[in-house]
Amino acid sequence: MTVLTADMVLTNKIAWALEKKQLPALLSWSFFMKVSELTTYLDELLEAHDFKDASYNGLQVAGPKEVKKIATACTASLEAIDTAIEAGADTLIVHHGLFWKGADPRLVGNYFLRVKALVEGKLNLVAYHLPMDAHKEFGNNAFLAHILGGDVVDYITPGDKNSIGMRVKLSEPLTVKEIAAILCHRLDTKVSLLGNITEDMMIDDLAVCSGSGSSLLDNDKQPTFQALITGDANEQTYHMAMETGTLVFVVGHHASEQEAINLLGEHLADKFKLKHCPIHFAYEKSVPTYCIDTDEDF
């Protein structure tokens, strides 16, 4: 399959202008590409067809055929959709789309409101799930490795991108406190720590799995990595962390998966000369938490 370039899209646009006799407009155009060209490029870049995914990857809701301004967000929430429309985008690219295999297909409740907003706002919805987790340049896990100054060694199952999680080696060891501080700052989030925590403990060997990635530890009776960075953790994760001596950094599902999609948006904007609106929400950071120590009865 031929990979699209900005020059190829430019050639297509000039041909269209000549056919439609729109030469005066060529001097003042805003660049565009077809949505089919965008999804074809993303399918190949992210190797989307190599994954067994619950998500329907690619175009999920059709809007304008021409793409001039993209918005990127972690999830196709109503807030993200409204933000993209207000920014004047014609295409919203997300990690978590609206349509999943085996899920209730009825367009009712808030899902109806999301689709209604997309259609009325004339906004394409494009989603890539596991391909965005596993990509070694633009993926969620690769981004987590990058912000810590780490190099991706391989996938958790060597050579198997469908295992999603990655083994990471830091260029220089960092303390637990330093890693937590970097994650808080770069992801704009709160970080919870599980395991026998010593703030000055040095770490250089990590596993990373964005989103609900605690299964990397939950299912590994003898983990060989010092620490795991993930979005969510469950009850079993706590016990495995304590019993195996593995430290777990829990950064929040949304926070672990929203920056890489914006990085992908920057790449698309630069490559195809599109406008780009990155959407960022500090959901986990803004959620209030309580720990009330009192003898008072409630």
Q: Model-found features: residue ranges?
A:
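Polybasic, lysine-rich low-complexity intrinsically disordered segments
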Residues: 14, 20-21
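Active-site catalytic microenvironments in core metabolic enzymes, especially phosphate/sugar-handling
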Residues: 33-298
